[in-house]
Design a protein with these regions (language model features):
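Conserved alpha-helical positions within TPR/SEL1-like repeat arrays
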Residues: 5-18, 25-28, 32, 41-56, ...
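Long, contiguous interaction/recruitment modules in multidomain scaffold/adaptor proteins
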Residues: 1-2
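Terminal, low-structured helical/coil segments at or just beyond the last alpha-helical repeat
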Residues: 154, 159-182
């Protein structure tokens, strides 16, 4: 096992133990080692791991930079699933920052890639992200529409647990929109 890979493994172990600052340092070292070796794909994975740790540390601006850097590297290597994952990650950071419009833009990009790849469950996950973000914006009818889209995709994908959660969210929102019986 080469040094960069060992450093990545060290980072994973540190994350598991809750040592986020130390994990961040390990992923930064791995990212630099992979960059020096010209291995853009593994560099992008280290960059993603770094950004995920930065989210845990609530350093959102740095996390966005990390996810965007990983996105660019994954785009260069045509790793479309990883590209979509980065868009989803970017969307979630924007959502956590209270930037719903930016979140929606990123989630929509992720959704488009997953749909193009025929990955229904992952597409449905993005629909639930869009629904939740629409709910945050008080766009309740749109949120309901997106929960229903997720429900359909989860059903097609055979993802029963996620389908049940989407159905529950859609039912609660639909009931709230109908208001109390007169």
């Amino acid at each position: 096992m080469d040094t960069a890979e060992k450093t990545m493994q060290e980072g994973y172990t540190l994350v598991q133990s809750g040592s986020h600052e130390e994990a961040l340092e390990a992923f930064l070292r791995a990212e630099a080692l992979y960059a020096a070796a010209g291995d853009g794909q593994r560099q992008a994975r280290a960059c993603t791991n770094k950004a995920l740790v930065l989210v845990q540390l609530r350093r959102f601006a740095d996390a966005l930079d990390g996810f965007r850097a990983a996105l660019g590297l994954f785009e260069k290597s045509d790793e479309f699933i990883r590209v979509a994952e980065q868009y989803g990650n970017i969307g979630s950071v924007h959502r956590d920052l209270g930037q719903p419009d930016e979140a929606l833009e990123s989630y929509t990009e992720a959704l488009a890639v997953y749909r193009e790849l025929g990955l229904r469950e992952r597409a449905a996950d993005q629909c639930t992200n869009i629904a939740y973000t629409r709910f945050m914006k008080k766009e309740y009818e749109e949120a309901l529409r997106w929960y229903r889209e997720a429900l359909s995709l989860y059903t097609q994908a055979g993802s029963e647990e996620k389908r049940a959660l989407a159905a529950e969210n859609a039912a609660r929102l639909a009931a709230a929109l109908e208001g109390p019986p007169e």
